[in-house]
Amino acid sequence: MRKKRTAPQKSKPSYRVNEQIRVPEVRVVLPEGGMQIMKTQDARRLAQDRNLDLIEVQPNAQPPVCKLENYGKLIYKMDKKDKDLKKKQKTTSLKELRFHPNTDKHDFDFKTAHLEEFLRKGNRVRATIVFLGRSIIYKDKGFELANRLTERLSTVANRDGEPKFEGKKLFVYFEPDKKKIEQFEKQRAMAEKIASLPPLPPDNSGEPEDDE
């Protein structure tokens, strides 16, 4: 039996640093801007004078390109970037809710509120409109529902492409829109603030005064 092939894992790039750089000369990217070709030993000395490391970043260039940077800080930044990317990949996912072409108003409002919440958290969403039995002959109702969803979610998202049929299911995808979500949150916070204000006292200025 053949062994199942697994995809190769990506490894972090490794850099030659300081004494590991054996070529006679290098092109140095200077921290203050610009580049300069110099002997490798001079570049190492320059790095030492600035309490930095000489790091080879483009070994295949002629001559190899190096930069002056703290090697420990470079590795830290790379690790942080990897962690942030993994965190983003974990939190962003596809959420799905199902509808029917004859979904009533209460069910529509309830499910749409959930889709809206998913989008506000930065997730993509898919609304799946399922046609049972002979209801497939009423495809127009599915498209009407898709348009209602698009209008309802337009405050936080954009529809990703046109609604698409696959068998007896109509799929509608939505992408969160950061600017729309920020505006939505501001308006909601303002509405909540106004709702929390105490009611104004009644205006009695127009009432006649009692005769003494």
Curated annotation (Swiss-Prot):
GO terms for cellular component: cytoplasm. Keywords: Cytoplasm, Initiation factor, Protein biosynthesis. Residues 192-212 are annotated as: Disordered. Pfam families: IF3_C, IF3_N. It comes from Chlorobaculum parvum (strain DSM 263 / NCIMB 8327). Gene3D superfamilies: Translation initiation factor 3 (IF-3), C-terminal domain (3.30.110.10), Translation initiation factor 3 (IF-3), N-terminal domain (3.10.20.80). Belongs to the IF-3 family. IF-3 binds to the 30S ribosomal subunit and shifts the equilibrium between 70S ribosomes and their 50S and 30S subunits in favor of the free subunits, thus enhancing the availability of 30S subunits on which protein synthesis initiation begins. PANTHER family: TRANSLATION INITIATION FACTOR IF-3, TRANSLATION INITIATION FACTOR IF-3, MITOCHONDRIAL. GO terms for biological process: ribosome disassembly. This is Translation initiation factor IF-3.
